[in-house]
Amino acid sequence: MIRSIFAITLVFASSTLVVRSSLSDDKKNSKSDAAKDVVELKGSDVNESSGLAVSNRDERRWWTHNDSGDKSRLYAFNHNGKRTGKCDLEGIKAKDWEDMASFQIDGQPKLVVADCGDNLAKRKSIWLYVFDEPDPNKSTDVDRIQKIQVTYPDGSRNCEAIAFDQSSKNILLIEKSTLPLAGIYTVTLPPASPRPVDIEVVAERVGTLNIPMITAVDVDPLNGDIWVVNYFQAFRFSRAETKNDLAAQLGKLPKVIDLPKWKQIEAAAVDREHQLWLTSEGKDAPLGRLNLDR
């Protein structure tokens, strides 16, 4: 049953969403009290970071990717912002990559990348790519990829936020909507196969979240808390007393924390110390953890 979730309603002074104006603002604000341990993602490869995931092969490493316009490629960085590796997905087209997530199945580190952007809501289906996480300290070509073609049950949707829920083995997708009426969907991870094959699935809609312009989501791998991010705030939904029910969890009143004033935050990931890390679009973009003590 679809549940209407009234977690929070944000009221805007105008109907125009004002996005952070320049990369110089990122650098000026990167040392504000809103974020800690801020570094810059150095190099010319990443100029529109749209997804972020903590490596489960090396917890000192991060994976990210560009938005549309790049090759089907991931980049690995250390906590100093230096690139340590990259990964090319063979035979995959990057139409509009918007998010990624890391997780483990039976001790095997995995990554999922979502080609799910659809600003005009015209795509008949989207793609999720699941594969074993490569070494973040090397350059790797990946050809064993589980390709999941996903159709929404209620028509085309623009989505920029996905996560993996370790307890249910579901991939979580949350719609990006200008209105605070974002659809919440899940896709069950297919069983592992020695030879991955393309599959087609219909996502299950499990609820509606009253937060507009959602750009990122991640699930704490240890306690199951869900972090939802839009351009201005982060929302932490505690898993306590929800019995692993995603809709019930996202129906709770969240803790709300203002984001740093960076150019355009579209990527977030939770580490194993329950810290939420963020990055922004733009060349030499900041990477830092949200200050949870404010």
Regions found by a protein language model. Give the residues of each.
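Positively charged n-region of N-terminal signal peptides that target proteins for export
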Residues: 1-4, 52
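Sequence/structural signature of beta-propeller domains
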Residues: 21-294
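Bacterial N-terminal signal peptides
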Residues: 7-16
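Hydrophobic alpha-helical context, especially transmembrane and signal-peptide helices
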Residues: 4-6, 42
